[in-house]
Amino acid sequence: MNNKTGALSGVTVIDLTWVLAGPYCTQMLGDLGADVIKIERPGSGDDTRKFAPPFVTDNEGKETTESAYFMSANRNKRSVEIDLTSKAGQNIIRKLVLEADVLVENFKTGNLSKYGLGYDDLK
C-alpha cells in the first residue's frame, strides 16, 4: 500500500531490474512517490547488493555486506524474492502485474518471454 506523496503517488511499479540503469530508473519513480515493488532472485538478490566498497555500516559502526550503491539505488522500494524460473513465481508476477500500473525490466531482449513474462504475454 502506498501512502507516499508526490507526483506519482498512487502509481504501482513492478521492478524487474538489476544492476545499474534499471534500478536507477525505478529509484526516480519511487522518489516521485510511486509504490515500487522490486523483484529479486531468491538467495542472492540484485547483483549490486555486494558491490565493492563503500559498504553500509551497522548500528555499531561495523561494515556490513550491503553496498552503499545498492541501498541508494533501491531506496523508496519494497523488495521481495520471487523465482522467475518457477511456475509458481511466474504466476505471482502475473498477479502483481494485474494490479500494477507500470512494469520496468532490463533483461536481455526475449529473456522474460522464455518464462511467459514478456510484453506479449503480459499486455
Where are these regions (language model features)?
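N-terminal helix-loop segment corresponding to the beta1-alpha1 unit
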Residues: 1-123
